[in-house]
């Protein structure tokens, strides 16, 4: 079956879940996908965004909010007692974070969609899937961002 992972910020009690981004949750599935969890992690860790070309054009407070924090890519087969409170030492971080931390994946996707190119790419993928997404939460996010079958989308402005 394989080991599933999520990115965990132990400082803030927040997580990123690969499936929220449409990626597989195994380490090599999401770590090599350029437009998903790793891109989200990059904007969360960015210090000084918005000061140069190639930065994410967004004022979203999530950008850079993880800079300097303790981050772990936690697997569901991870060691018990590592990175968790002493009273929870029989759990691993993946399990503990799943139950106690806040998954901010969809909020980060919304921040990424402040960039017209990223938003257009996400829309084109959804359109190619017939405006259907296997993940119900991500489907609702797309309907909120793009409208039913893309009714809110306009011609890209980045071209």
Go through each PLM region and give its residues.
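Short, extreme N-terminal segment that most often corresponds to the first beta-strand
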Residues: 1-22
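Low-complexity intrinsically disordered segments
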Residues: 29-159
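Short, surface-exposed structural microsegments at secondary-structure boundaries
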Residues: 17-19, 23-34
């Amino acid at each position: 079956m394989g080991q599933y992972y999520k990115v965990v910020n132990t400082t803030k009690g927040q997580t990123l879940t690969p499936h929220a981004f449409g990626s597989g949750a195994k380490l090599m599935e999401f770590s090599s996908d350029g437009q998903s969890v790793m891109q989200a992690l990059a904007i969360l860790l960015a210090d000084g965004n918005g000061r140069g070309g190639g930065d994410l054009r967004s004022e979203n407070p999530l950008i850079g909010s993880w800079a300097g924090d303790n981050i772990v890519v936690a697997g569901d087969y991870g060691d018990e007692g590592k990175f968790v409170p002493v009273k929870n030492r029989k759990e691993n971080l993946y399990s503990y974070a799943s139950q106690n931390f806040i998954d901010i994946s969809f909020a980060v996707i919304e921040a990424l969609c402040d960039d017209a190119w990223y938003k257009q790419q996400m829309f084109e993928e959804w359109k190619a899937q017939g405006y259907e997404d296997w993940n119900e939460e991500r489907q609702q996010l797309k309907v909120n961002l793009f409208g039913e079958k893309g009714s809110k989308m306009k011609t890209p402005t980045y071209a």
